[in-house]
């Protein structure tokens, strides 16, 4: 893609210290251990460097794919002609400016965030202590477990809004949180960090709850195998794992991809899974569950399609706006001329 190639050249010329990897295999980053190369993989050292990368992409009509720990994503083996921006170096974590709050940048792991909250006697993030993701991804998908969700503890979110090239703070109540999704999925932005509003509690009591949740997780989930977390979102009135199990699909295998024999809600890589294996496996499960129960399962894993391109069409949008303004100006001028011609001297 011409715009992407231009952006890469400008970034290399103007940001020589940036960790920029060309033709980077995504299997090296994704927890499922599947995926071909993306055209470029940028790892900014801080928010300013990340903003600069996004500026060059924006000016060349390209949108990036911003990722954290890549724990719920699958890339095609053929690779994609896109740039991925990793938030892994955005790891600032501190107590917030207001009482009982914590500020964390997008790359902070949810486990580290929960531990920091515990160490400071702040309760509310226990549920997140075993979720294998980062703050950015957790906020984007409203991650949750054991009855808790990110929306319950988010006071505000800091995003880089691409159309205006500016940092914006969004109140938690304005984030459009729903079950395993947020309003940020619908706008051209990147999550940079978040402020969490928590409740004071005894650190030992917080730690005990975290330990109990993590012991349950270890006992019930296939943490010893590559996976992308829960394969499907929880349907209304039930659980995906229970439906899959009831339909006799626990252990169902396509190539190297398998519905876990330990927990039917997980798809795992038995060692040689491919993108096509995962797609076929999940598609079969969805069709079979629907055939037997008339319930449609919605994937929780983000599977990026083959040939996907990310375009920022701001120039076209801007031109459309300008054309509309010019047309309106013509109409206004025509209206004024008509009014003038109606005026007759007395």
What are these regions (language model features)?
Residues 72-73, 114-117, 125-129, 142-149, ...:
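A generic local secondary-structure boundary/capping motif
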Residues 35-36, 41-47, 74-92, 140-172, ...:
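Structural signature of FAD isoalloxazine-binding scaffolds in flavoprotein oxidoreductases
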Residues 36-37, 69-71, 80, 108, ...:
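Gly/Ser/Thr-rich helix-start
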Residues 2, 6, 27, 45-48, ...:
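Conserved active-site and cofactor/substrate-binding residues in soluble primary-metabolism enzymes
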Residues 77-80, 137-140, 264-266, 310:
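Short secondary-structure transition/capping segments
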């Amino acid at each position: 893609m011409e715009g992407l190639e231009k952006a890469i050249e400008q970034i290399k010329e103007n940001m020589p210290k940036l960790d920029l990897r060309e033709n980077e295999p995504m299997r090296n980053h994704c927890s499922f251990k599947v995926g071909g190369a993306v055209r470029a993989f940028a790892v900014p050292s801080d928010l300013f460097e990340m903003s600069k990368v996004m500026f060059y992409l924006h000016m060349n009509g390209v949108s990036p794919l911003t990722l954290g720990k890549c724990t719920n994503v699958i890339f095609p083996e053929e690779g994609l002609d896109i740039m991925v921006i990793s938030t892994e170096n955005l790891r600032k974590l501190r107590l917030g400016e207001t009482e009982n709050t914590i500020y964390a940048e997008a790359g902070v792991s949810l486990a580290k965030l929960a531990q920091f909250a515990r160490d400071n006697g702040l309760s509310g993030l226990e549920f997140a202590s075993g979720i294998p993701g980062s703050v950015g991804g957790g906020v984007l998908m409203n991650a949750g477990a054991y009855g808790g969700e990110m929306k319950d503890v988010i006071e505000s979110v800091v995003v880089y809004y691409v159309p205006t090239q500016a940092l914006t703070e969004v109140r938690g109540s304005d984030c459009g949180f729903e079950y395993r999704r947020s309003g940020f999925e619908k706008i051209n932005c990147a999550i940079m960090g978040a402020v969490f509003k928590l409740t004071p509690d005894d650190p030992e009591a917080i730690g005990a709850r975290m330990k109990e949740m993590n012991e349950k997780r270890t006992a019930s989930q296939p943490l010893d195998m590559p996976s992308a977390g829960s394969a499907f979102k929880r349907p209304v009135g039930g659980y995906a794992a229970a439906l899959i199990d009831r339909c006799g699909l626990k252990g169902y295998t396509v190539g190297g991809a398998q519905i876990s024999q330990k927990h039917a809600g997980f798809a795992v890589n038995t060692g040689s899974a491919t993108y096509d294996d995962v797609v076929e496996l999940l598609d079969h499960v969805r069709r079979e569950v629907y055939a037997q129960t008339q319930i449609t399962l919605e994937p929780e894993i983000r599977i990026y399609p083959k040939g996907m391109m990310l375009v920022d069409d701001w120039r076209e949008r801007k031109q459309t706006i300008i054309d509309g303004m010019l047309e309106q100006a013509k109409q206004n001028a025509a209206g004024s001329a008509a009014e003038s011609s109606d005026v007759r001297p007395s």
